[in-house]
């Protein structure tokens, strides 16, 4: 599974690079960047992709394979992922939501990118951290597509009890297999089931446990009225892992946000979703 977290995936029509950006003392996050080989496409402003909790690149390969030939793409992996380089003992507070937006801002600063010129695409935790960062003035944007954002991270009672207990490392493999089984049961879409299984099996479980303990306490602010980034919230009714009513509540709270419904969560990971992405960006004058 190490190959999931290293190397710059080479995609047709673009030059690829991988690098790490120090976002806090002893913590660096992995960044992938593609620049189209076509000079006209390469001159466009970048789209920045922030994937979800524990998400691996392979889940996004179908979309990015097409997208990287059209414009520069920057793909930022958040610090809970196995790819991040953390050279000290990790703590629960390292993975609190408040850090993630500043991490993304640090990456843009390193690359010399003004967040106000960015077209964002994000998913799940990636979408949640951007909403919080927009509200707090940490990041701006020209446009933002938010796939299945989480206003909170609601765990079942048994999981909340388990997360409060010390979990010995020798239990980790069994716990991971159990988690994969549970996700398989809860997920209606086959493509989504495959992606989650692959992502879960590729994780550093210690980091994911600490991240879960941080996320279980998190609630998106009720007041999102300070957001000035034009936002489209994307969702699929077949996505049983993200509460549609909570997603709709986010749409209502973000000024002038629009809802974009897609056929499935898997569709949002495929090249076909570029139709919806580019339609929204065109509608706001991009």
Residue ranges and their predicted role:
Residues 27-86:
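Conserved HGGG/HGGXW glycine-rich cap/lid loop of the alpha/beta-hydrolase fold
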Residues 75-121:
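Active-site loop/oxyanion-hole signature of alpha/beta-hydrolase fold enzymes
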Residues 1-47, 70-71, 280-286:
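Alpha/beta-hydrolase fold catalytic core
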């Amino acid at each position: 599974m190490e190959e999931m977290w290293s190397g710059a995936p080479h995609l047709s029509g673009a030059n690829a690079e991988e690098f790490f950006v120090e976002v806090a003392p002893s913590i660096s996050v992995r960044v992938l960047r593609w620049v189209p080989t076509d000079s006209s496409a390469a001159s466009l402003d970048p789209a920045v992709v922030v994937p979800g909790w524990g998400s691996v690149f392979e889940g996004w390969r179908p979309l990015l394979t097409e997208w990287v030939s059209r414009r520069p793409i920057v793909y930022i992996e958040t610090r809970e992922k196995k790819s991040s380089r953390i050279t000290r003992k990790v703590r629960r507070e390292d993975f609190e939501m408040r850090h993630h937006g500043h991490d993304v801002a640090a990456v843009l600063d390193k690359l010399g990118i003004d967040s106000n010129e960015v077209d964002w695409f994000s998913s799940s935790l990636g979408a949640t951290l951007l909403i919080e960062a927009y509200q707090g003035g940490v990041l701006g944007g020209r446009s933002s597509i938010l796939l299945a954002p989480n206003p909170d991270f609601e765990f079942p009672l048994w999981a909340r009890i388990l997360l409060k207990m010390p979990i010995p490392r020798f239990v980790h493999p069994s716990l991971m297999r159990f988690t994969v089984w549970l996700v398989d049961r809860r997920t209606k879409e086959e493509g989504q089931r495959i992606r989650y299984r692959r992502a879960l099996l590729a994780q550093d479980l210690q980091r994911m446990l600490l991240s879960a303990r941080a996320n279980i306490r998190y609630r998106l602010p009720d007041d999102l009225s300070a957001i000035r980034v034009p936002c489209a919230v994307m969702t699929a009714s077949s996505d049983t892992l993200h509460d549609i009513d909570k997603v709709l509540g986010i749409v209502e709270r973000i000024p002038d946000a629009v809802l974009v419904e897609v056929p499935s969560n898997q569709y949002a990971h495929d090249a076909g979703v570029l139709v919806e992405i580019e339609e929204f960006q065109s509608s706001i004058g991009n």
